[in-house]
Structures are given as structure tokens and as C-alpha cells.
Design a protein with these regions (language model features):
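Phosphate/nucleotide-binding beta-alpha loop and adjacent structural elements of enzyme active sites
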Residues: 1-134
Length: 134
């Protein structure tokens, strides 16, 4: 298999976001923490990339989106690839309540030819729900 890792976050466009590094599940992007006091030493600038800008004309066959609540933004940054290549997708739906409904609709709008499957695997924690797009 041909794959590579990139030291960047998945997003809708190429940018830099401020991230609060608290460790584990308490880490987040700054906009989701407005109004709460933040230790400046925990703020990190993170390079964010859209998949479309990164892969250009490469053919993509599989994408896994498990980006801790930023799945919608990551899908927005992959519109061209999804329309052009119809890669198989695995999209996490459990980070934000609205994603259970909004993300299947978004995927179908990007490429109506997908068949969608919801699966809840026996993971710990037990609320992990995934959308498979074939």
C-alpha cells in the first residue's frame, strides 16, 4: 500500500489553528473554549491542511476521518477528491451529536453514488459509531 503521514490537522482549508493541549480528551481548538481561562503555555499553533490541496491530482482510494469532532471540516476539505475519485470512506459519527445526521447527508450531497452503512463495533468506549461509504 502506498501511504504517507503528514504532521498537520485535517481541515476545510490550509490554515493555522490554535489548539489547547491539555492531554487526552480535554484538548481542543481554541474556538470551542471561548470564555474559559487558558494557560498560555498550553496553546499550540497547528498547521491545518485540506486533503484537496495536499493530494492535487493523485488518485485516492480510501480515507478514514476520525478527527475528534472536525469530521465535517475535513470532509469539506476533501470535496474534490470525493467527487473525482469516490474513495471508500470511514467517518466517525460519535464526536458531535449532530454528526449522526449531518455527515451522511453531507457525504451523499458530495457524491450521491455512495452506499452508506452505519456500524457500532464492540469498542471501549461503546458509543463509537462509524459511517462506511462504499
Amino acid at each position: 500500500y502506498d501511504f504517507r503521514t503528514v504532521n498537520a490537522g485535517a481541515w476545510s482549508c490550509d490554515t493555522v489553528c490554535e489548539f489547547i493541549s491539555k492531554g487526552g480528551r480535554n484538548s481542543s481548538l481554541i474556538p470551542y473554549e471561548k470564555g474559559k481561562p487558558v494557560n498560555p503555555s498550553r496553546i499550540k499553533e497547528i498547521e491545518m491542511r485540506s486533503l484537496d490541496s495536499f493530494v492535487k491530482d493523485e488518485r485516492i482510494t480510501y480515507i478514514k476521518y476520525d478527527v475528534e469532532g472536525s469530521e465535517s471540516e475535513a470532509l469539506d476539505g476533501s470535496k474534490t477528491v470525493i467527487k473525482r475519485d469516490k474513495p471508500k470512506l470511514l467517518v466517525s459519527l460519535y464526536h458531535r451529536t449532530e454528526d449522526m445526521f449531518a455527515l451522511p447527508i453531507k457525504v451523499t450531497e458530495l457524491n450521491p453514488s455512495y452506499k452508506l452503512y452505519l456500524r457500532q463495533h464492540p469498542y471501549i468506549p461503546a458509543w463509537d459509531m462509524n459511517l462506511y461509504c462504499i
